[in-house]
Regions:
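Structured soluble/peripheral alpha/beta segments that form catalytic or ligand/cofactor-binding pockets
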Residues: 26-320
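C-terminal motif of bacterial Sec signal peptides marking the signal peptidase cleavage site
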Residues: 20-22
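Sec-dependent N-terminal signal peptides
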Residues: 12-18
């Protein structure tokens, strides 16, 4: 995937005009379906899929990490497409949930497409590739630019994982880092997958783990793992992230994880993660247990046959 290098906000005037056209849901569209050989892909043609596109900017400096997660989800309904997008900024253990919106659009043959809304604007390349994410609200502004692809993988359930160079602009300040783009889909309007994590050891190694299903179901979640290491890329078809400690979250009347043990099925990966800050939100429901979305800033260590890596990053936990 070829992407241009990050741009400064001052270059965006022409691109923003193109963005509105490129993201318009009224133009002719090709159907967007899950790919791969998994069950989600097989059922997509007969049932309406739900989609996630998640973007996370991360930059590690010393013992601290600068995180900007953007999480988006779309679900097709008979009367249209339900869309939601959420944005956070985390630094020095403090979380700012600066954007959270849900809205409906007209029925679409490409419901997975990410669209601008309100204070959320997008830069889009040919082929509907998101090239930049912009938040503007009065004097507040935050821009993410996505650069060159560093590593890219696909999964059996149609998921795609891309690691990219990137930059975040807060006003006149620029921070360079790495961007994860994780896209997932499922048939029948169900959850596209379970919990996931993005952790990195500076510029030397980045790891992504994504579960096939949520916790609390009939089957235990199994993760797939991907890594961009100094001299090679790695994949693990079976990884377990076991909870080793939990904490209560009374607003949802649930326990949520506080630390994790990582281990791969082939014993070539091992590690542990610990939450050091979090942003948790309870959803709406009839109860007694409510939905929850929890974002954790984590630290820990991941060991592979290539070496041991001190890591810092993000874990996203959801119960729907």
């Amino acid at each position: 995937m070829n992407r241009p290098s990050p741009r400064r906000p001052g270059t965006l005037a022409v691109a923003l005009a193109a963005m509105v056209i490129g993201c318009s849901d009224s133009q002719p569209e090709a159907p967007a379906e899950p790919t791969g050989n998994g069950s989600a892909a097989e059922g997509a043609g007969a049932e309406t899929p739900a989609f996630e596109q998640n973007f996370v900017f991360a930059s590690v400096s010393g013992d601290s990490v600068f995180l900007v997660p953007w999480l988006t989800r779309t679900t097709s309904r008979p009367d249209g497409v339900l869309r939601e997008a959420h944005g956070w900024l985390a630094r020095s253990g403090t979380w700012d949930a600066f954007y959270s919106e849900k809205w409906m659009t007209a029925p679409s043959r490409a419901p997975a497409r990410v669209l601008p809304h309100g204070n959320l604007q997008l830069l889009v390349q040919e082929g509907d590739i998101v090239d930049g994410i912009i938040f503007e609200d009065g004097t507040r502004s935050l821009e993410l630019t996505l650069g060159e692809s560093r590593a890219s993988w696909g999964g059996p359930r149609g998921e795609t994982v891309d690691l990219l160079t990137g930059a975040a602009f807060l006003g006149d300040d620029r921070v360079d880092g790495v961007v994860l783009h994780l896209a997932r889909a499922s048939a029948g309007g169900g959850a596209p997958g379970g919990d996931w994590a993005f952790v990195m050891s500076g510029d030397s190694a980045q790891f992504v783990f994504a579960a096939d299903v949520e916790y609390g179901g009939e089957a235990e979640p199994v993760y797939r793992g991907w890594a961009a290491l100094p001299d090679r890329g790695r994949q693990w078809p079976e990884v377990h992230l076991d909870w080793t400690a939990t904490q209560a979250f009374p607003p949802a009347r649930r326990d949520v994880p506080a630390s994790w043990r990582l281990r791969s099925g082939d014993a070539s990966l091992d590690g542990e993660l610990h939450a050091i800050s979090s942003e948790m939100q309870a959803g709406e429901g009839t109860g007694p247990l409510l939905p929850v979305r929890a974002l954790f800033e984590v630290v820990g260590e991941v060991s592979t046959v290539e070496g041991d890596f001190a890591v810092h990053g993000l874990v996203v936990h959801e119960r729907r």
